[in-house]
């Protein structure tokens, strides 16, 4: 139990520390309502080249492809969507953890790490979904904020 609390505290602190990284964001960053950050807990570094898929639940209750991306050198993906397309609904972010660990020569337990969340049900918001990965576990957290003016 203490380990999980410490892990979540570490993930949250890494999320805020990583904002200090020398990432140059364009003026369009304020228009980025969904951002993803992925960290490698084993190496203590950003998880580079993690494939990420975003799905939106349809009225027929099926998951429809919404967006895709791959983490950059900072373990981040910006501009997965824009304000106009990112409406109210249920979304799933799927991290391809198997391919990430396999490329590093590690045989992981999980094929994917999924985060399912409801977006914009209380008004327009911006979401940062952060994932801390290891071969046999993962932890996620989210920062939900009002859009930047």
UniProtKB/Swiss-Prot annotation:
Q: Which PROSITE patterns match?
A: TRANSTHYRETIN_1, TRANSTHYRETIN_2
Report the subcellular localization: Secreted
Top-rank taxon, per record: Eukaryota
Key word Signal present: yes
What PTMs does it carry? Answer: Sulfonation of the reactive cysteine Cys-32 enhances the stability of the native conformation of TTR, avoiding misassembly of the protein leading to amyloid formation.
The residues listed in the UniProt record as binding L-thyroxine, with positions renumbered to this chain, are 37, 76, 139
Q: Which UniProt keywords apply?
A: Gamma-carboxyglutamic acid, Hormone, Secreted, Signal, Sulfation, Thyroid hormone, Transport
Q: Name one GO cellular component term.
A: extracellular space
- Which residues does UniProt assign to the signal peptide? 1-20
| Residues annotated with 4-carboxyglutamate modification | 64
Which family does the UniProt entry place this protein in?
Answer: Belongs to the transthyretin family.
- What is the protein named? Transthyretin
Gene symbol here is: TTR
